[in-house]
Amino acid sequence: MYIISSKNMLLKAQRQSYAVPAFNIHNLETMQVVVETAAELRSPLILAGTPGTYSYAGTGNVVAIARDLAKKWDLPLALHLDHHEDLADITRKVQAGIRSVMIDGSHSPFEENVALVKSVVELSHRYDASVEAELGRLGGVEDDLVVDAKDALYTNPEQAREFVARTGIDSLAVAIGTAHGLYTAEPKLDFERLAAIRDCVDVPLVLHGASGLPDSDIRRAISLGVCKVNVATELKIAFSDALKAYFLENPGANDPRHYMKPAKAAMKEVVRKVIHVCGCEGQL
């Protein structure tokens, strides 16, 4: 079984004080590079897709490609639903073989968030799928969701304790000052808050918006309980910058088998760096 739940890999990371990287995928090349590099480094791996990614590529196609790559590289991996909000959509995707779910009800009032998350937990656990939920809101842009900085709310540690207990989630995404997309100013993470959250809950913690963070901040967050680190924008920038540079040098190029090579090489360097920072190399 090559498409697995992320629950056990995150619990192992929690016990051994490293983090599992979750790379957002957008096309075939992204999936190829991420799986190949993780396999070479014997790193646990989560492939994450937003609703927009699954809509763009087709859920069945994503599942089939992920399964084929995992088998080719002998790398069991978690295929993850990132920032999903609709129960019916989640149900279809879990039934299609996906075993890792992030239900995002962070835009809703607390009681509504709890109710939605509980319903997703009840569904997902019937299929042995793990569930991540977010408490608090990150600023920035993720897929079609835009959260202004003034609307971003940090996670309350005591509320996190209640949230985890009432929902039965397997991991908790925390808001401590990160943001989706590119940072317009130097991020200042609330590590004191993160430590307090860790002391209030026993599930692995998740850090969204890691692209652009200093390596030292990521390592410190891992030391304070973060077991899953999400990376999206950094991969997209590496991919697109390499493509742009190739076409500037080769304006007549038209063969994707050629111009995708430098783009894949650029992404590979990002994946290697993230795995190194997460401390998960050789943890399979």
Curated annotation (Swiss-Prot):
- Required cofactor names: Zn(2+)
Q: Tell me which UniProt keywords the record has, alphabetically.
A: Galactitol metabolism, Lyase, Metal-binding, Zinc
For the keyword Cell division, the answer is no
UniProt-annotated binding residues for Zn(2+): H83, H180, H208
Q: How is the cofactor bound?
A: Binds 1 zinc ion per subunit.
Q: Which GO terms describe its cellular component?
A: cytosol
What's any GO biological process attached to this entry? D-tagatose 6-phosphate catabolic process
- EC number from the UniProt entry: 4.1.2.40
A molecular function GO annotation: zinc ion binding
Spell out the reaction equation it catalyses: D-tagatofuranose 1,6-bisphosphate = D-glyceraldehyde 3-phosphate + dihydroxyacetone phosphate
Short name of one Pfam family: F_bP_aldolase
What are the binding positions for dihydroxyacetone phosphate in this chain? G181, G209, A210, S211, N230, V231, A232, T233
Q: List the pathway annotation.
A: Carbohydrate metabolism; D-tagatose 6-phosphate degradation; D-glyceraldehyde 3-phosphate and glycerone phosphate from D-tagatose 6-phosphate: step 2/2
Q: Which residues form the active site?
A: D82 (proton donor)
Asked if Protein biosynthesis is a keyword of the record, the answer is no
Judged by the first EC level, this protein's enzyme class is lyase
Q: Which InterPro entries match?
A: Aldolase_TIM, Class_II_FBP_aldolase, FBA_II, TagBP_ald_KbaY/GatY, TagBP_aldolase_GatY
The record describes the protein's role as: Catalytic subunit of the tagatose-1,6-bisphosphate aldolase GatYZ, which catalyzes the reversible aldol condensation of dihydroxyacetone phosphate (DHAP or glycerone-phosphate) with glyceraldehyde 3-phosphate (G3P) to produce tagatose 1,6-bisphosphate (TBP). Requires GatZ subunit for full activity and stability. Is involved in the catabolism of galactitol.
Q: Provide the family line.
A: Belongs to the class II fructose-bisphosphate aldolase family. TagBP aldolase GatY subfamily.
PANTHER family membership:
D-TAGATOSE-1,6-BISPHOSPHATE ALDOLASE, D-TAGATOSE-1,6-BISPHOSPHATE ALDOLASE SUBUNIT GATY-RELATED
> Can you state the subunit structure given in the record?
Forms a complex with GatZ.
What name does this protein carry? D-tagatose-1,6-bisphosphate aldolase subunit GatY
Which organism is this protein's natural source? Klebsiella pneumoniae subsp. pneumoniae (strain ATCC 700721 / MGH 78578)
